[in-house]
Amino acid sequence: MRPSEYICLCILSAVCSLAVSPTIVAAFPTNTQHDKPSRNAEQRTAMIHDLFTFSSADTVVAWSATDDRVMGGISRSRMRFYAGGYALFEGVMSLEQNGGFASVRAAVKPPPLAGVTHYVVEVRGDGKRYKLSMRTAGRFDAVSYQSTFATVADTWTTVAIAVNTFVATFRGRRVIDAPPLDAAKVNQVGLMIADGQDGPFQLAVRRMSVEAQ
C-alpha cells in the first residue's frame, strides 16, 4: 500500500467513527472522590451547572419518596445523607399487590444555561438499572420524562445521559403525543427503580448536573 493510500484510509476511518455517538455518553470509573473522568475534547469544553452536590445533610431535605404504595403496592424507599459526601437512594422494591416501582423526587430550579445537551450523575450502584426522571409541569401527578441508565456494582461511575433520550410517560405508560423534554422548563428531578427488579436496592449519588455546549 502506498503512503497516500494509507493516509486516505486513516482519514476515512476517523470520519466514520465520529459519525456515530452513543445516546448514553459514558460511564467512567471514578473510584475516589477526587478522581475526574477523562472526556473527549468536545465534552471538556462543555458548560456545567450543578443541580445537586450532596455535601451536607440539608441537601437531602428536599427529597421525598413516591412509591407504588400510592396504587396499593408495598415497595418503599428513601433518600438519606452519608457523611462521606453522598446521598443514598435505598429501599425494597416489591411486585406484590400489583406494585413495581420505588422513587424519590425533589424540586429544582431550571438550569441557567441555554442548549442543555446532557444530564450527568455521579453514582455508585448495585448493578441494577435506574431511571432519571424530569418533570416540567408544576403538578405532582404530571407527565414524567424518563431515561434509563445502568450501574456497576460497588463502583463510582459518571454517567452522561443525552436530553433527547428522555421518554415522556404518565403512570408508567408512554405518552406518544408529548413534546420532547425541554430542559429549560424542568422544575423537578427524580430517581426511580422499576422494570421488575424486585428486592433490596441501593444507589449512592454524589452529584447531579447538566451540561450545555
Question: Where do the model's predicted regions map?
Answer:
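Bacterial N-terminal signal peptides that target proteins for export
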Residues: M1-I11
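Short, low-complexity intrinsically disordered segments enriched in A/P/G/S/L with frequent Arg
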Residues: S4, C16, S38-A41
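Bacterial N-terminal signal peptides
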Residues: L9-P22
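Beta-rich carbohydrate-recognition modules and glycan-binding surfaces
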Residues: I24-Q213
